[in-house]
Amino acid sequence: MENLIIYAFIYLLGSISFGLILTKFFAKTDIKKEGSRSIGATNVLRVVKEKNPKLAKKLAIATIILDFAKAAIPLLILKFLHYDQALLWSVAVLAIFGHCFSIYLLFEGGKGIATGAGAMIVLLPLEVLTAFIVWAVTGKIFKISSLASLAALLAFIVSSFIFNYDLEIHTHAPVFIIAFIIVYKHLPNIKRLIFKEECKVI
């Protein structure tokens, strides 16, 4: 019963769309109706930048931090309390699933990059660092957020086998579940990348 309560709480917490809340409160804008209609930091920056560039950067950064924290903080607490690895990985998956398929948004949501990074920094920090470097380099070169995110995801998966071939839970299944969720949410971006129609973020 205790585990079920934890899982429900994490899903509900993960479902909170901070980008949507921040832009409605501070920018009086509904990002679900503008830009890419995503609730993530990239769309926050893109939409709010048209009206207030300085505010756009602040809200985008705040969105990243809060989306990151809603996965990282609960996992840190549970890890400190010595919950087992199976539960921690389940919590990580649920936090990301909640962000991507929010119950508050009729199971729509973001794309899971910041929340995924928040979850994985607790469980696989070296892999997240590797992914961050790839994300930063790809973003710097191509200036395309989705391409940088997908490249980082690939780097994360590969490095998870290099640095942690035998995870404590003896399976990489949660890594692939998380990757599947993120790739699924990026399918429209992948299509635009193939046809060279994806917008740059400058």
Swiss-Prot record:
GO-annotated molecular function: acyl-phosphate glycerol-3-phosphate acyltransferase activity
InterPro entries: G3P_acylTferase_PlsY
Pfam families: G3P_acyltransf
Gene Ontology CC annotation, any one: plasma membrane
EC number(s) per entry: 2.3.1.275
Superkingdom in the source lineage: Bacteria
The protein, known as: Glycerol-3-phosphate acyltransferase
Organism whose genome encodes this protein: Campylobacter jejuni subsp. doylei (strain ATCC BAA-1458 / RM4099 / 269.97)
